């Protein structure tokens, strides 16, 4: 993993810790800065601090960090992400107020913001999800593959014992696990449906390449809907479910 991605992943853990316990979060961010900011400051660290401040309604401090992150980000893409967040917080708006969820690109960035807010999700799941969303405009099929991975990783994190039982019995498949969770009434029919939709879309994105010649890459990319709001909404349904389930059942993540 590149240093930049390692910083991003670790900053999400520190973000979660601060959101839930500022003392632990301050310590985690201090350690992260000691490790990576000896020569220069890093935009992703300060963006994650800003999100943690915003989660705890410390909006002036959040805005200051978002502005610093924008200055520190080395590429236009991330500067635009920071500016969008600056605009939203400056107007004292939540993601629900700011984004038009009927517009696919807005829905992408709404989802991005919600992942930062869903601090009861597994840290690595949040990282993979944010990474997939950040490149979704140009690599949507790969994002679908990542969303399937997000689903599987979070199921393994939240329902570890059930997954281990299926692995031990050599009967593991994501479809089997989803059906088992529904049979045990751990998830509703609607959640199970959303999970199966993401599972199948990820499978399709993985295997559809086989339908095209090696030199026919453009046709592969073009074979996917560029305005796939349905799958984004399925993903949001799943992420919200797990965030709420983990919070309500006091499922602990490592400090």
Which residues make up each language-model segment?
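Structural motif corresponding to the intra-repeat A-B loop/turn of tetratricopeptide repeats
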Residues: 20-22, 56, 93, 137
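Charged alpha-helical initiation segments
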Residues: 75, 80-141, 244
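Charge-enriched, short contiguous segments at helix-coil
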Residues: 189-255
């Amino acid at each position: 993993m590149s240093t930049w991605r390692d910083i991003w992943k670790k900053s999400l853990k520190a973000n979660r810790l601060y959101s839930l316990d500022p003392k632990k979060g301050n310590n985690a961010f201090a350690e992260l800065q000691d490790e990576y900011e000896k020569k220069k400051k890093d935009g992703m660290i300060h963006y994650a601090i800003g999100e943690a401040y915003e989660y705890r309604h410390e909006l002036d401090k959040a805005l200051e960090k978002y502005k610093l992150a924008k200055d520190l980000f080395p590429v236009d893409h991330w500067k635009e992400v920071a500016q969008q967040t600056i605009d939203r917080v400056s107007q004292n708006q939540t993601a629900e107020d700011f984004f038009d969820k009927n517009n696919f690109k807005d829905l992408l960035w709404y989802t991005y913001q919600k992942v930062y807010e869903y601090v009861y999700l597994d840290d690595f799941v949040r990282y993979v999800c944010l990474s997939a969303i950040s490149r979704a405009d140009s690599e949507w099929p790969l994002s679908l593959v990542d969303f399937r991975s997000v689903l599987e990783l979070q199921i393994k994190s939240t329902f570890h014992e059930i997954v281990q039982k299926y692995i031990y019995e050599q009967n593991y498949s994501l479809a089997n696990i989803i059906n088992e969770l529904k049979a045990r009434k751990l998830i509703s029919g609607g959640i199970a449906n959303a999970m199966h939709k993401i599972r199948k879309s990820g499978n399709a994105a993985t295997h559809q390449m086989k339908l095209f010649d090696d030199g026919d890459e453009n046709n592969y990319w073009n074979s996917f809907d560029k305005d796939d709001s349905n799958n984004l909404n399925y993903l949001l349904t799943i992420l919200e479910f797990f965030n709420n389930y983990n919070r309500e059942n006091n499922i602990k993540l490592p400090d």
